[in-house]
Amino acid sequence: MAKKSKVVKHERQKALVEQYAELRRTLKAEGRYEELRKLPRDSTPSRLHNRCALTGRPHGYMRKFGMSRIRFRELAHQGQLPGVKKASW
């Protein structure tokens, strides 16, 4: 489990990105880069790093499921992920 402060920070960053998304899009399209530069640093989506929705773990993130590989494996073995089954060939 990640530190609670990191998880809270990530949620705050996601909210900032969402809040400034439209303004950022219009400023970029109009080429008003000086005003774009004055926006909060954390409002750019490139600063976000994907984290597991359940544990907050930043590494081993599976984008399709929104969770880390470890938590994915646990839930898949328990049969709690619909449509996921163990592969065999």
UniProtKB/Swiss-Prot annotation:
Keywords: Ribonucleoprotein, Ribosomal protein, RNA-binding, rRNA-binding. It holds the Pfam family Ribosomal_S14. InterPro entries: Ribosomal_uS14, Ribosomal_uS14_bac/plastid, Ribosomal_uS14_CS, Ribosomal_uS14_sf. GO terms for cellular component: cytoplasm; small ribosomal subunit. GO terms for biological process: translation. GO terms for molecular function: rRNA binding; structural constituent of ribosome. Signal peptide: none annotated. Binds 16S rRNA, required for the assembly of 30S particles and may also be responsible for determining the conformation of the 16S rRNA at the A site. Part of the 30S ribosomal subunit. Contacts proteins S3 and S10. Belongs to the universal ribosomal protein uS14 family. This is Small ribosomal subunit protein uS14A. It comes from Listeria welshimeri serovar 6b (strain ATCC 35897 / DSM 20650 / CCUG 15529 / CIP 8149 / NCTC 11857 / SLCC 5334 / V8).
